[in-house]
């Protein structure tokens, strides 16, 4: 069976990003975005998704982190879409409820090729450090470019870092379920016959 993998490059006046994904070959993640907090979240995603994942990214972070975070989401989404391919034999759906200390987050997704994002996370504004509002921008960009229906809900939580960590880990775990093979590796999981 052909390996499900992709390599996508995105180069604009604002960012330069290369993403490699291999759904069938688990490698140690290689993450370098010049944004320490984003690196940490993407490493968590990669480890918990169980996929081969590499990203090298740079951009105009002297302005702020928005362009790089959003473009990383775009590029990862495009790579996921290409790697998943025709979706024959995949489970298609995934969901995970993940605790992280005082935080509890739930992620559910569908790889049907239709974009939708529901994002409910009560993350408090923080004057210094990472702009946590960019997490929603990241997942919007990723889901819209991958064609994923994605529901993210923080059920409870107090610490911004823990909330973000639980969301990225839960997303990785839900994606792991969705891209795994079902017992019938030859059919597309839809009554339409295609996704």
Curated annotation (Swiss-Prot):
Name of the protein in question: Imidazoleglycerol-phosphate dehydratase
One GO cellular-component annotation of the UniProt record comes to: cytoplasm
Q: Which SUPFAM superfamilies match?
A: Ribosomal protein S5 domain 2-like
InterPro entries, A to Z = IGPD_sf (IPR038494), ImidazoleglycerolP_deHydtase (IPR000807), ImidazoleglycerP_deHydtase_CS (IPR020565), Ribosomal_Su5_D2-typ_SF (IPR020568)
Organism expressing this protein natively: Endomicrobium trichonymphae
Q: Which family does the record assign?
A: Belongs to the imidazoleglycerol-phosphate dehydratase family.
The EC number(s) attached to this protein equal: 4.2.1.19
Q: A Pfam family matched by this chain, by name?
A: IGPD
Its pathway, per UniProt, is: Amino-acid biosynthesis; L-histidine biosynthesis; L-histidine from 5-phospho-alpha-D-ribose 1-diphosphate: step 6/9
Q: Could you read off the lineage of the organism from its UniProt record?
A: Bacteria, Pseudomonadati, Elusimicrobiota, Endomicrobiia, Endomicrobiales
| Enzyme's top EC category | lyase
């Amino acid at each position: 069976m052909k390996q499900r993998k992709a390599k996508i490059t995105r180069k604009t006046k604002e960012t330069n990003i290369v993403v490699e994904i291999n759904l069938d070959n688990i490698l140690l993640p290689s993450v370098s975005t010049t944004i320490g907090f984003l690196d940490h979240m993407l490493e968590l995603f990669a480890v918990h998704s169980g996929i081969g994942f590499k990203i090298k990214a740079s951009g105009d972070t002297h302005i702020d982190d928005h362009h790089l975070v959003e473009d990383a989401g775009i590029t990862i989404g495009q790579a996921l879409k290409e790697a998943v391919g025709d979706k024959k034999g995949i489970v298609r759906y995934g969901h995970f409820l993940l605790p992280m200390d005082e935080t509890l987050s739930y992620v559910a997704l569908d790889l049907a090729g239709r974009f939708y994002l529901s994002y409910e996370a009560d993350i408090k504004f923080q004057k210094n450090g990472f702009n946590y509002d960019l997490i929603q921008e990241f997942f919007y960009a990723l889901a819209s470019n991958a064609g994923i229906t994605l529901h993210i809900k923080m059920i409870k939580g107090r610490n911004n870092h823990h909330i973000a960590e639980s969301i990225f880990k839960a997303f990785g775990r839900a994606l792991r379920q969705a891209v795994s093979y079902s017992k019938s590796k030859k059919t597309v999981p839809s009554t339409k016959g295609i996704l």
